[in-house]
């Protein structure tokens, strides 16, 4: 199940009747890195990754190869089955120019992130903490908008929790 890869994204071909044939064809064009896995399924190509950013390169490759014919579903958080259901919790680090730190702190709090450490290095403010992955989806794009493209961030799976 790739427990270490808590994000899934499906790719389908709008014009091919057999999604598994599309997935097998697409798989030949993709280089599988250490931080992602790709599987052909009856629903299309399943792509599993450690973070949204880890899927950017394969998504760009599929868009370049298939253009408008490829249907990319939004990223989905993968939980561990059982009672109770276990969801992925991510450790994150965000570095942003000091002038954008208030907006970024507010964004992290709105996402129910637990900021465990905050410090400044020269003109950069760094936030470290944890949050459920479901609350962090889309964070990269939002940080780029808040900081005019000057932020950096990284996430990794910390653990699973109910």
Which residues make up each language-model segment?
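Accessory interaction regions appended to the cores of large information-processing enzymes
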Residues: 1-162
């Amino acid at each position: 199940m790739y427990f270490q890869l808590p994000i899934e994204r499906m790719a389908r071909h709008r014009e091919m009747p057999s999604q598994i044939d599309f997935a097998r064809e697409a798989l030949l064009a993709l280089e599988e890195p250490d931080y992602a896995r790709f599987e052909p399924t009856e629903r299309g190509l399943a792509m599993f990754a450690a973070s949204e950013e880890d899927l950017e390169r394969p998504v760009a490759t599929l868009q370049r190869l298939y253009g408008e014919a490829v249907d990319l579903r939004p990223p989905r958080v993968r939980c561990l089955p059982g009672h109770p259901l276990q969801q992925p919790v991510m450790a994150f680090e965000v570095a942003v120019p000091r002038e954008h730190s208030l907006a970024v702190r507010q964004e992290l709090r709105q996402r129910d992130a637990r900021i465990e450490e905050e410090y400044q290095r020269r003109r950069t403010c760094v936030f470290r903490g944890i949050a459920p992955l479901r609350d962090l989806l889309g964070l990269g794009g939002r940080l780029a908008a808040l900081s005019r493209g000057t932020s950096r961030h990284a996430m990794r799976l910390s653990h699973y929790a109910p």
